[in-house]
Amino acid sequence: MSTDTSIKAGIDSIRAKADDLHLAEDSSNGTQANLDKHQIKATTAVGQDNGNNAGVADHKNDKNNKNNKNNNDDDDDDEDDDVAAAAAAVGDAGSDKKKKKKKSSNKKKKKKLVSIDQSYPDGVFPEGEWQEYGLDSNKYRTTSEEMRYLDRQQNNKWEDFRKGAEIHRRVRAKAKSSIRPGMTMIEIADLIENSVRAYASADHTLKAGIGFPTGLSLNHVAAHYTPNTGDKLTLGKDDLMKVDIGVHVNGRICDSAFTMTFNEDGKYDSIMQAVKEATNTGVKEAGIDVRLNDIGAAVQEVMESYEMELDGKTYPIKCIKNLNGHNIGDFIIHSGKTVPIVANGDMTKMEEGETFAIETFGSTGNGYVLPEGECSHYALNSGVESIKPPSDKAKHLLNTIQSNFGTLPWCRRYLERTGEEKYLFALNQLVKAGIVEDYPPIVDKRGSYTAQFEHTILLHPHKKEVVTRGDDY
C-alpha cells in the first residue's frame, strides 16, 4: 500500500470514529496524536534501514562496533522526510476545525551534516583494514611486546589518521550518491569540499579540513585538475572521472582516490578493474623493509594483464609510468620517497612508522603524461624562507598562503575564500621566484582514458593499516 493510500485510510477511520462516538473537539485532537505517534514509529523504522556505509567492514571488535553505530547520525533519508510530511498532513486534515489547508511543499528537508566529533565523542575512531607483513623477516614484529609498546606511543598520530579516514569515507559516500551527469565541475567540487568542511568543523585551518584541492580529472586528464572560478565544464554521461580527495587532521593527510563512471554499457569495466586490482596489489606488497622497485614490478604485472575494447578495437591497459605513489609527511603530501607503478630499479626500502599513499593509474593511451591546460593546483615550497618576495603584493599573498595553508596544497578557489582578489600577477611572481610551486593538469593523449585508485597505509611496527579502506573500495 502506498503512503498516500495509508494516509487517506487513516483520515477516514478517524472521521468515522468521531461520528460514531460523538467525540468532542479535544477528543478528536487526542485521536490524531495517536495517529501521529504511529506515523512517527513508521518513520523510525524506515530510518533504521540505513546500513553503515562509512565504516570498515573487516573490523568487528567491540570498540569499532560501538563507534560504527553512530555513522548514520547525519545520513540523508528522503523517505523519512516523506513519511514525516505525510504524518503532518494527516494532522491538518483530521482536525474538526475549519482551517485553511496549508500547501504541501515538494522540497525534501535535508539533514545538516554535523562534525564527526559528535559521532565519536570519546575521540576513538574506526581502525582501517589490518594486513600482515609479507616478509618472513618481519614475522617477529607481530608477537613482539616491545613493538606493540612502541606503536602505542604513537596513538595520537594514528587517531588523527583514523579521524581523517572516517571523514573521507563519509564524504565519498555522499559524493557517490549525489554526483550526476550534467553537474558542473564547480558544483561537484563544492559538494565534496563543503562536506569535508562540515565533518571536520573547519574551513581553511591548519588544525583540520581539506588536505589538498579536490581532483576531478576527466578521461585523458589523469590528475591535478580542479575547476577554477568561472569554469563551465560539465560532467558528461560517457566521462570517466577520477575523484581524488584529501582530508587532514593536525597535518596528518589521508589521500585516497577512486574513479566514477556513469555509462551503463560497461565499456569502462576493464580499466576500472585493472586499476583497482593493481592498487590492491600495491597495498598488499607494501611493508617494512620492502623495496620500492618490487612494489612497482608487482603493480605493473597486474595492470598490464588487462586490455579494454572500445568501438571494436582492443587497447592494452598500460601503467602511467611517470606517476607514482608517495610518502606522506605532516602537512606535506609528497614527502621524500616515491612508490613506482612499474619496475624501475629503485632499491630504497620502506621503513617502520612511515605513511604512504599507494596509488596506481591505468591508461589506454601512451602510458605517459605531460602538463597541459590552465593551472589550478599550487603549494608552498619548503626551505624558501630566505627568498625575498618580488613585490609588496607578492609578500601580502605569501602571508595569506602561509597563515591559511602552510605547506598544504591549495587552489585558486581556496585563495578567493580567504578574501583575496586580483592576485594572479602576484601569484605568478611567487611561482617564478620559486617560492610557490605550480602543478598544472597532467594528461595522456587525447581520446584515451585513464583511471585511478588510491589508499593511504600506515606502517605500524607489527602490521600495516589500510586506514582509508571502506566498503566501497
Curated annotation (Swiss-Prot):
Its cofactor is Co(2+); Zn(2+); Mn(2+); Fe(2+). GO terms for cellular component: cytoplasm. A divalent metal cation 2 binds at residues 255, 326, 359, 454. It catalyses: Release of N-terminal amino acids, preferentially methionine, from peptides and arylamides. Residues 23-121 are annotated as: Disordered. Binds 2 divalent metal cations per subunit. Has a high-affinity and a low affinity metal-binding site. The true nature of the physiological cofactor is under debate. The enzyme is active with cobalt, zinc, manganese or divalent iron ions. Most likely, methionine aminopeptidases function as mononuclear Fe(2+)-metalloproteases under physiological conditions, and the catalytically relevant metal-binding site has been assigned to the histidine-containing high-affinity site. Residues 97-113 have a biased composition (Basic residues). A divalent metal cation 1 binds at residues 244, 255, 454. Residues 41-53 have a biased composition (Polar residues). GO terms for biological process: protein maturation; proteolysis. InterPro entries: Creatinase/aminopeptidase-like (IPR036005), Met_Aminopeptidase_Type2 (IPR050247), Pept_M24 (IPR000994), Pept_M24_MAP (IPR001714), Pept_M24A_MAP2 (IPR002468), Pept_M24A_MAP2_BS (IPR018349), WH-like_DNA-bd_sf (IPR036388), WH_DNA-bd_sf (IPR036390). Residues 73-83 have a biased composition (Acidic residues). It is an enzyme of class 3 (hydrolase). GO terms for molecular function: initiator methionyl aminopeptidase activity; metal ion binding; metalloaminopeptidase activity. It is found in: Cytoplasm. Keywords: Aminopeptidase, Cytoplasm, Hydrolase, Metal-binding, Protease. Pfam families: Peptidase_M24 (PF00557). Substrate binds at residues 224, 334. Its EC number is 3.4.11.18. Belongs to the peptidase M24A family. Methionine aminopeptidase eukaryotic type 2 subfamily. PANTHER family: METHIONINE AMINOPEPTIDASE 2. NCBIfam families: met_pdase_II. This is Methionine aminopeptidase 2.
